[in-house]
Amino acid sequence: MVKGEYGMNLPSHQRGASVTGIVIMIVLIVVCAKIGLAIIPAQVGHYQLKKSLAFELKKSNDNKESVKEFLGNVNSQWHINGVSQKAEDVVEVVDNTPGEMSVKLKYDEANNFFGNVDIVNRFEDTISAEDAKVAKP
């Protein structure tokens, strides 16, 4: 112990966090939370989009539908689900054999981080006919 002015006993080493350390920790927590709030909804939305696309692909392959019918069904389902994208813009048909159709889902989603800084999520998945066979609604 160090004897301070006015006869107080002061510790010779600081214990605990300083004000600067606490402020830095709060800023880091806020930045991590903000990044999480920008990324997590995009990931959840992509999961739902991929799941609905796989189920529509399963139905289309079971009914041996054409690419045009498949994309029409996907657009109808996405409209019901409130998806703003059009299937023609984000879905590419890899194999268009009726009953064995495979597709590639590819798109970007940008979320504002702050000011003019955006977080861009790029998604690219291929759903084969085999993958679609096990799809559930």
Q: Where are the language model's segments positioned?
A:
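Envelope-exposed proteins and targeting segments
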Residues: 45, 87-89, 99-103, 107, ...
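Short amphipathic secondary-structure patches
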Residues: 59-101
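Alpha-helical transmembrane signal-anchor/signal-peptide segments
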Residues: 40-58
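A mature extracytoplasmic/lumenal domain signature
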Residues: 53, 105-111
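Low-complexity, S/T/G/P-rich flexible repeat/linker segments used as non-globular hinges
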Residues: 112-137
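Hydrophobic membrane-insertion alpha-helices, especially the h-region
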Residues: 21-36
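Glycine-centered recognition micro-motifs in short, flexible terminal segments and loops
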Residues: 6-23
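Charge-rich alpha-helical segments
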Residues: 21-22, 100, 137
